[in-house]
Design a protein with these regions (language model features):
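Conserved helicase/translocase P-loop NTPase motor core
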Residues: 313-372, 381-389, 395
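Basic- and hydrophobic-enriched, low-structure N-terminal and domain-boundary segments
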Residues: 1-159, 163, 177, 366, ...
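Helical/strand "switch-coupling" subdomains that flank nucleotide/phosphate-binding cores, especially
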Residues: 208-319
């Protein structure tokens, strides 16, 4: 440890400011960890671990609001004296070091107490986690590669949010840090790769992973009907047309199989064959309506529907791999990635409904899943103002989150932002208990629910968040044994 200064006037049990020794202002920087020997080197009241934030440089002769000789001298090109300059940092206490780990500090931090900078050999995390059952991430404290970051294993199923603007490194962080962590904790990982570019290309050749295209997966019949409802503008607003679609969807897998066989035998497009089967079925149902007025209305609605609805709209829901078979593949693989690239939004959301309903039913049966569900582009599933099928997906995420805490289901939601149009629905976000904040979008810099509201109580400003380098994240919440957010980073493996 290195002595760097003493506690200044105005300290409390939760705040202190250290005045740096002369010459250390260029060496000591924000986010470093320090140890306060509260009360002095000899017989201190306690020893407090803290993190440096909020640096401040003071020179009373260089105030921009008053005219002094030093200011005049500087205006004409001179260099004023630095003899009375004072440099300081605020200290956010992490906790008191005890034989059982860390405890909250309840004693006033005494002015004049010496402050020591922790160096590479003074790894503090062994002190933090003495009581907790922890795993160690491959991430480390910024500036100290040997200080691996501990994670409280118990809180993994309490759900995770990863936030960062484009280019902040959130996908890399998830691939290289979170997914290996979940596997180390005994979880199987299912990744929903919304664009098909952030995860699927990196796991295609991995022996412990499998990539499957969304178009190969079938949906449950309720989700197929929700998808068709969205694509047909609520079946043209006609109950008879809706009933016709509903009856066709019954036994969907068999109908898809029949269309595939016929297409192969006759050299046709499978989706065109299935489309014709569906259209003929709907027209037949309408033809059998006995009430003349109802029949006329259904015919008009049917024409509207099939002007809007095209054969290619069926392609995303013609898969044959069931959700049960998809989850079954997790028994032999650590990781399965669903490549959703190229599919229509409605098809992606329809698949998620099928998956989430099945997961929920398993948990209702009392089964512990031990699955981590990683959802890229989470606002697509749970936007701030959900409409249509997104209302259903948002509600299902809330249900999964509530029951998942008890049934070992981890939800990891990845988003460009925290609030508003780039963020996750507020009701869903309240279910996430661990957060990784990367470089934020300017829309998140202020206002209710933004990054500033989450982190400013810990001395982290929006200015800092806007300027974070890629791959740097503030780690906060239930999985972090430290009650104060810590700035962490990682080194992606070569190749």
């Amino acid at each position: 440890m290195k002595f760097i200064g003493r506690v200044a006037d105005g300290s409390t049990e939760t705040f202190a400011r250290v005045i740096l020794l002369k010459g250390l202002e260029g060496e000591v920087v924000a986010e470093q960890l320090v140890l306060i020997k509260n009360g002095g080197d000899e017989n201190p009241l306690n020893q407090i671990l803290g993190v440096l934030r909020g640096g401040l440089g003071k020179n009373e002769f260089l105030s921009p609001t008053s005219y002094r000789p030093d200011v005049a001298y500087m205006r004409y090109g001179g260099e004023p004296s630095g003899a009375r300059e004072v440099y300081s940092f605020s200290i956010k206490p992490i906790g008191v070091i005890t034989g059982d780990g860390l405890e909250p500090n309840l004693a006033i931090i005494q002015p004049r107490s010496p402050v020591y900078l922790l160096e590479e050999e003074d790894n503090p995390f062994q002190l933090i986690v003495k009581k907790d059952e922890v795993l160690w991430m491959d991430a480390f404290m910024e500036g100290h590669e040997s200080w691996k970051i501990p994670v409280n294993k118990f809180f993994i199923p309490y759900h995770v949010g990863v936030y960062g603007s484009t280019g902040s490194g959130k996908s890399w962080f998830t691939r290289f840090i979170l997914i290996p962590l979940y596997i180390k904790a005994g979880y199987r990982v299912l990744v929903l790769d919304w664009s098909g570019t952030d995860y699927a290309p990196y796991y295609g050749s991995a022996s412990n992973a499998e990539v499957i295209s969304l178009t190969d997966i079938t949906l449950d019949e309720d989700s197929i009907l929700s998808y068709l409802k969205d694509k047909t503008n609520d079946f043209g607003g006609n109950d008879n047309v809706k009933d016709a679609f509903d009856s066709f969807v019954e036994g969907w897998l068999e109908k898809v199989g029949k269309a595939l066989d016929e297409a192969m035998a006759e050299g046709k497009d499978p989706e065109k064959v299935l489309y014709d089967l569906l259209k003929n079925h709907v027209n037949k149902v309408i033809e059998n309506i006995t009430d003349r007025r109802s029949k006329t209305a259904a015919e008009r609605a049917g024409r509207r529907v099939f002007r809007r609805f095209k054969p290619e709209d069926l392609e995303p829901i013609m898969g044959l791999v069931t959700v049960e078979e998809l989850l079954g593949r997790l028994k032999s693989k650590d990781l399965v990635v669903v490549d959703m690239g190229g599919a229509l939004t409605e098809a992606k959301l329809g698949f998620f409904l099928s998956l989430s309903k099945h997961l929920y039913s398993l948990m209702e049966e009392g089964k512990d899943l031990k699955i981590a569900l990683v959802m890229d582009e989470a606002p697509q599933y749970a936007p701030w103002d959900p409409k249509g099928i997104q209302r259903e997906t948002t509600e299902m995420i809330k249900n999964l989150a509530a029951l998942g805490r008890k049934r070992m289901l981890n939800l990891t939601l990845i988003a460009q932002g925290i609030k508003g149009e780039i963020g996750v629905n507020a009701a869903v976000r309240r279910n996430l208990n661990t957060h990784f904040f990367g470089r934020i979008h300017p829309l998140d810099a202020s206002g209710e629910g933004g990054a500033s509201e989450w982190l400013s109580p810990y001395g982290i400003t929006p200015d800092q968040m806007l300027q974070l380098k890629p791959g740097r994240f503030y780690f906060t919440g239930a999985m972090n044994p430290s009650p104060i957010p810590l700035l962490i980073t990682y080194k992606p493996p070569r190749g």
